[in-house]
Amino acid sequence: MYVTDTHPLVYFAQMKPARLGRRARRLFRDAEDGRSLIYIPAIVLWEVWMRVVEGDFTLPMRFDHWCRGFDEAPGFAVEPLNWRCIDESRQFSFNDPFDCLIAGTAAHLGMPLIRKDADISASDLIETIW
């Protein structure tokens, strides 16, 4: 079981697997086939929406339909934001509050985070996979 950051999920949704690292690409394929489980922090969905509105990302369908697809997919689960995730996020000192909350969710669940960025990888507080 794994937790995804925003960019890997968007690359997967945009059908751009070449932008994912080899291990991340395999994990998303396995989840798509129901052989693995990737948790999507609720805050990731909010960040995706904000980035769509800003024009940074495009999705292959309407946002609500895209989110609903994760409810129906056996290899994905949306993880709600709760106080435990927020509490865990306090150990991270990244400039981006989304990064802190996503990393806090991974720490709370005790799962590796699918992410490329070196700032979280260098923290040694959670395992990252790319």
Question: What kind of feature is each model-predicted range?
Answer:
Residues 8, 44-45, 85, 102, ...:
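Alpha-helix capping/helix-boundary segments
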Residues 58-60, 64, 72-116:
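Active-site neighborhoods of divalent-metal-dependent phosphate/nucleic-acid chemistry enzymes
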Residues 2-7, 41, 95-99, 117-118:
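Histidine- and aromatic-rich ligand-binding microenvironments
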Residues 15-16, 51, 92, 126:
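Residue-level signal for well-ordered alpha-helical positions
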Residues 1-40, 54-69, 109, 123:
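Short, well-structured N-terminal submotif of metal-dependent ribonuclease cores
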Residues 48:
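Phosphate/NTP-binding elements of NTP-utilizing enzymes
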Residues 1, 103-130:
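Acidic, PIN/NYN-like endoribonuclease modules and their adjacent C-terminal/linker elements
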Residues 37, 75-77, 126-127:
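Conserved beta-strand segments of alpha/beta enzyme cores
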